[in-house]
Regions:
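Metal-dependent nucleic-acid phosphoesterase active-site entry motif
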Residues: 1-20, 39
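PIN-domain endoribonuclease scaffold, especially VapC-family toxins
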Residues: 3-5, 24-98, 108, 112-116, ...
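Short aromatic-hydrophobic micro-motifs that form the base-stacking/packing surface
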Residues: 119
């Protein structure tokens, strides 16, 4: 079974914004990772806000979320309203570093989906978070 990878906000923004100083490294990593990458609505919301001055990048991101083509680079994992309390528990568990909703949702999804690899630029926080196996996440790039 191929390794599944969660993607955080930073790489999405960097991939879609050629002026981002992480653009080249994130595009290179994207091509080396097994596809599709997995994410969730809180991450997309954060990325859209950060890309708000680049409407074409926002459109490209949103199109990638709804692509029905096999092998697309991004797949959104569903989050039900009933899972909000579990995400809140993640936020409480890591309250010392004040996690954002997107991070907490990814940590929760990592446990639910048994994924231990995260494509993120937020090494500081994701070095603290633990996978469902209670081990540090594998961080890419």
């Amino acid at each position: 079974m191929k390794r599944r990878v969660l993607v955080d906000t930073g790489p999405l923004v960097a991939i879609l914004s050629s002026v981002d100083h992480h653009h080249a490294a994130c595009v290179k990593a994207l091509h080396q990772l097994p596809g599709p990458l997995f994410s969730c609505w809180p991450v997309i919301t954060e990325a859209v806000w950060l890309l708000r001055s680049h409407p074409s990048a926002v459109q490209q991101l949103l199109r990638s979320c709804f692509s029905e083509k096999p092998g697309g680079f991004l797949e959104l994992l569903p989050l039900a309203g009933t899972e909000a309390s579990a995400i809140a528990e993640v936020m409480k568990q890591y309250q010392d570093i004040r996690p954002q909703l997107a991070d907490a949702a990814l940590v929760y999804l990592a446990a639910r989906e048994r994924i231990d690899t995260i494509f993120t630029l937020d090494r500081r926080d994701f070095a603290v978070y633990r996978s469902w196996q209670k081990r540090p996440f594998r961080i890419v790039p």
